[in-house]
Amino acid sequence: MGRTQTVLALESSCDDTAAAVLRKGATGETQVLSSIVRGQDSLHAAYGGVVPEIAARAHAEILDICVEDALQAAQTSLHDVDAIAVTAGPGLIGGVVSGVMCAKGLALATGKPLYGINHLAGHALTPRLTDNVPFPYLMLLVSGGHCQFLLIKGPDDFKRIGGTIDDAPGEAFDKIARLLALPQPGGPSVERSARQGDAKRFSLPRPLLDRPGCDMSFSGLKTAVLRVRDGLVQDQGGLYPQDQADLSAGFQAAVVDVLAEKTSRAMQQYQQLSPTTATLCVAGGVAANMAIRTRLETVARDNGAVFVAPPLALCTDNAAMIGFAALERMADHPPDDLTLAARPRWPLDSKSPAMLGSGKKGAKA
């Protein structure tokens, strides 16, 4: 039987500033004592997307307030915390630096150990926090900047078996929202618009379904939507609300079809591990899309697997997942020192080759 451990965690890799306090009991159960998330939607709304410089300044201004709020909500203090955890990458470098510097300051001032956590590991391990999913499990990590299939065999054992070779679905949703003059963030806007639309009105491609493997591509789908939109604007002088809804529905249906087929293929590879309880997990901000969730649940059932999707609040960026990832690692990994660096790019599976088209500056994750 171990001892009780309490972790204060920080997350600031994109446009959500977050802090959380988690406690792992002597018998291994973990409680989220508090989880504070402060979004920046109003700061970026006028620009049609996240502006890194604005995001970084906002993180720097509010991180300490989030920490105070998280400690107060957890009814604890820095003195009672056993460790500090922080997202050290990947992400927008200004925001990651803000979080890392704040965490270093807290660690230095309190003498507490510091743990730099991969943001994607936080997402990938969340099903163990919410549902105590046993290893190994299959994870579809689908977020604003990332999309990959991972075989997860341990807290630090991730094997990528496929992913997007260009735009991640979250990026594609944001770009489609801009094309259709829908508000940002694009994911929820496109999903809302799609509910009123006819997905069959326009013929849109399902990229890479004619090729083997689990890799995906969404840039061609985005281009197809652009061409349809431009044709409508040329023919009728603009877009009507029904045009927006039908294009949203068609785009979303295409994304769902691609994710479903590629997930079925990934399930076949995963089943070769002969897991005791086959489990398909989905995490990341795009996993909040209910059309995607519903279809993936069907894929899991058709493949004889349990489907696990964390609550929506733990799918989008949060610090609770960072704290849990730290708790998972603390038993077998030493803490980081104060030379911990912020990393804009940090592949979870460093042994796999970089994805083709994974980014102009290298592999995102």
Swiss-Prot record:
Binding-site residues, Fe cation: H119, H123, D317
Enzyme class label: transferase
EC number(s) from the headed UniProt entry: 2.3.1.234
Cofactor comment: Binds 1 Fe(2+) ion per subunit.
Cofactor: Fe(2+)
InterPro entries cross-referenced by the UniProt entry: ATPase_NBD (IPR043129), Gcp-like_dom (IPR000905), KAE1/TsaD (IPR017861), TsaD (IPR022450)
Principal subcellular localisation of the protein: cytoplasm
Gene Ontology annotations for the cellular component aspect, listed alphabetically: cytoplasm
Region of interest called Disordered, as start-end residue ranges on this chain: 342-365
Record keyword Acyltransferase present: yes
Localization (cell): Cytoplasm
Listed GO MF terms: iron ion binding; N(6)-L-threonylcarbamoyladenine synthase activity
Binding site for substrate: L141, V142, S143, G144, G145, D174, G187, N289
The keyword Iron is annotated on this UniProt entry: yes
Domain of life (superkingdom): Bacteria
Keywords from the UniProt entry: Acyltransferase, Cytoplasm, Iron, Metal-binding, Transferase, tRNA processing
Reaction equations catalysed: L-threonylcarbamoyladenylate + adenosine(37) in tRNA = N(6)-L-threonylcarbamoyladenosine(37) in tRNA + AMP + H(+)
Pfam family, one: TsaD
BP terms from Gene Ontology: tRNA threonylcarbamoyladenosine modification
NCBIfam families reported for this sequence: gcp_kae1, T6A_TsaD_YgjD
Protein family according to the UniProt entry: Belongs to the KAE1 / TsaD family.
PANTHER family hit by this protein: TRNA N6-ADENOSINE THREONYLCARBAMOYLTRANSFERASE, TRNA N6-ADENOSINE THREONYLCARBAMOYLTRANSFERASE, MITOCHONDRIAL
Protein task: Required for the formation of a threonylcarbamoyl group on adenosine at position 37 (t(6)A37) in tRNAs that read codons beginning with adenine. Is involved in the transfer of the threonylcarbamoyl moiety of threonylcarbamoyl-AMP (TC-AMP) to the N6 group of A37, together with TsaE and TsaB. TsaD likely plays a direct catalytic role in this reaction.
Record protein name field: tRNA N6-adenosine threonylcarbamoyltransferase
Organism, as annotated: Roseobacter denitrificans (strain ATCC 33942 / OCh 114) (Erythrobacter sp. (strain OCh 114))
Gene name in the database record: tsaD
